[in-house]
């Protein structure tokens, strides 16, 4: 049996803040764009059963999930469109932004295969969209998934490293999704590209929640955090445990904040994937509860201003 989508109105938000910038979410239109991973029926994924989200999720649906929360800006992250559709996805997102309040999604992180011979052409095409801010090419998802794909080989590709180093000249950042086993190797690569702004997705995906696994994750995270151009997204907390555990979220998020510092972390919803396990209201209530003892300026940094600055979002 598939997971049930949570009720977006089920949990009230008790803590009030001026504004939220959602640093990580997704949209999709299955009628216009091919998403092979999402459209495969009856296939379980590392984040759980995708059946409930195998339907269109447009900007209007995202806004409905947001409800009354003061989300004034958002950052869309590419979501695995089939290769011919990667630029089409960005063009569609730009059109969605033109139809929504506040222009959501205000920033677009698009896909480009940085190893492809036509990568520069793809980057040029993506740049036609005014909301483009960065590129994501996933380096690691989960150990079992990565063993069946070529993503783990990207770090060994000279072409990948060369094109990665070219992103700053295009005023583009890089969203980095990987697993803890790759943190050290990636840190070595990024140390050679100090002018590249990098956003680490999902706290570095701590898939092994054992004491040894968490210690290994913390060690890798600490190594990556030595690079001042790398920021950390506090998101994707249900990717491996497949339930919303506020205490686990608190422990993971506060560890990342302690390692990276308040000024280099930002919260994201990872909706609608996270919607499999939690409502938007409960998600942000948990986020605000875990930083309840922080100062007002620190809360704003984590909830809004860090993402606004990183992705160059206008007020």
Model regions and ranges:
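Conserved, mostly hydrophobic/aromatic
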Residues: 24, 74, 108, 135, ...
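Active-site gating/metal-coordination segments in enzymes
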Residues: 2-9, 84-181, 231-240
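Mid-to-C-terminal alpha-helical segments outside catalytic/metal-binding sites
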Residues: 1-23, 32-65, 73, 255, ...
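Histidine-centered catalytic micro-motifs
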Residues: 20-30, 200-203
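Divalent metal-dependent hydrolysis catalytic cores, especially in the metallo-beta-lactamase
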Residues: 42-55, 60-82, 103-113, 133-140, ...
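Short, well-ordered coil/turn segments that N-cap beta-strands
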Residues: 17-19, 69-75, 101-107, 129-133, ...
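Catalytic pocket-lining loop regions of alpha/beta-barrel enzymes
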Residues: 150-266
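Acidic-and-aromatic substrate-binding clefts and catalytic sites of carbohydrate-active enzymes
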Residues: 52-53, 81-87, 112-120, 145, ...
């Amino acid at each position: 049996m598939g997971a049930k989508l949570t009720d977006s109105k089920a949990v009230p938000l008790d803590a009030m803040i001026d504004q939220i910038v959602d640093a990580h979410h997704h949209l999709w239109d299955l009628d216009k764009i091919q998403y092979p991973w999402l459209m495969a029926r009856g296939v379980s994924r590392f984040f759980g059963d995708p059946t409930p989200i195998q339907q269109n999720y447009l900007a209007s649906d995202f806004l409905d999930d947001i409800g009354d929360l003061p989300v004034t800006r958002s950052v869309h992250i590419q979501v695995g469109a089939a290769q011919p559709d990667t630029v089409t996805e960005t063009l569609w997102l730009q059109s969605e932004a033109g139809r929504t309040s506040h222009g959501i999604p205000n920033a677009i992180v698009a896909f480009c295969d940085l190893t492809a011979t036509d990568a520069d052409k793809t980057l040029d095409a993506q740049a036609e969209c005014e909301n483009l801010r960065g590129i994501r090419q996933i380096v690691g998802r989960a150990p079992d998934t990565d063993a069946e794909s070529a993503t783990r080989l990207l770090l060994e590709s000279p072409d990948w490293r060369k094109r990665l180093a070219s992103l700053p000249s295009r005023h583009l950042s890089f969203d980095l999704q990987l697993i803890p086993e790759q943190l050290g190797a990636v840190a070595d690569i990024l140390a050679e590209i100090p002018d590249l702004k990098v956003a680490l997705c999902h706290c570095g995906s701590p898939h092994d929640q054992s004491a040894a696994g968490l210690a290994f994750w913390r060690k890798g995270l600490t190594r990556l955090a030595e690079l001042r151009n790398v920021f950390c997204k506090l998101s994707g907390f249900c990717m491996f445990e497949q339930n919303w555990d506020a205490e686990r979220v608190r422990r993971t998020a506060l560890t990342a904040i302690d390692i990276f510092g308040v000024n280099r972390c930002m919260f994201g919803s990872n909706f609608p994937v996270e919607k499999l396990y939690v409502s938007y209201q409960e998600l942000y209530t948990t986020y605000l509860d875990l930083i309840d003892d922080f100062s007002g300026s620190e809360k704003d940094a984590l909830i809004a201003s860090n993402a606004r600055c990183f992705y160059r979002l206008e007020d």
